[in-house]
């Protein structure tokens, strides 16, 4: 039987406990999980690619079958390069499903071998998004129950730098 691998793409700006939950669960379902951290030029990320990779590694590095890779360009091309089995996407709400369904179908048009696997987050993470976390942190709110400790510390450093 061949090894199964799944790509979990995102900007992870920052990684949240919801992301950690999905990767942890995927690591039990697939032989290999590739956390593919998009450069995200169009999103103007708060954290650099290097910072986001380091935060993901510190949050998930204890999982031996998880690797962390920065990438740029079309996901479907990265999928082919990695020879992945599938792409993992999290679904928090019906609105996520509509967008992800459209995206998966477009990617399948570009590559008929493209497969998407959808997981819903554990209930306590269903409302968390990186966008909300950044906004709470920007306004100096407490995000400790939503993100790994390394992210809390990274936000503290951003505040010390005048963010």
Swiss-Prot record:
Coiled coil: none annotated. ATP binds at residues 11-12, 19, 90-92, 100, 125-131. Substrate binds at residues 11, 43, 75, 89. GO terms for molecular function: ATP binding; pantetheine-phosphate adenylyltransferase activity. Pfam families: CTP_transf_like. Keywords: ATP-binding, Coenzyme A biosynthesis, Cytoplasm, Magnesium, Nucleotide-binding, Nucleotidyltransferase, Transferase. Its EC number is 2.7.7.3. GO terms for biological process: coenzyme A biosynthetic process. Reversibly transfers an adenylyl group from ATP to 4'-phosphopantetheine, yielding dephospho-CoA (dPCoA) and pyrophosphate. This is Phosphopantetheine adenylyltransferase. It comes from Acinetobacter baumannii (strain SDF).
């Amino acid at each position: 039987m061949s090894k199964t691998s799944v790509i979990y793409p995102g900007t992870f700006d920052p990684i949240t406990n919801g992301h950690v939950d999905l990767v942890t669960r995927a690591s039990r379902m697939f032989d290999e999980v590739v956390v593919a951290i998009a450069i995200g030029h169009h999103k103007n990320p708060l954290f650099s690619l290097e910072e986001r990779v380091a935060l993901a590694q510190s949050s998930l590095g204890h999982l031996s079958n998880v690797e962390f890779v920065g990438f740029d360009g079309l996901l479907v091309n990265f999928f082919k390069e990695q020879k992945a089995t599938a792409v993992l996407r999290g679904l928090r709400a019906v609105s996520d499903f509509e967008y992800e369904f459209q995206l998966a179908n477009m990617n399948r048009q570009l590559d008929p071998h493209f497969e998407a696997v959808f997981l819903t987050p554990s209930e306590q993470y269903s409302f968390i998004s990186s966008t909300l976390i950044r906004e709470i942190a920007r306004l100096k709110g407490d995000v400790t129950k939503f993100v790994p400790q390394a992210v809390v510390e990274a936000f503290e450093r951003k505040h010390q730098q005048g963010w």
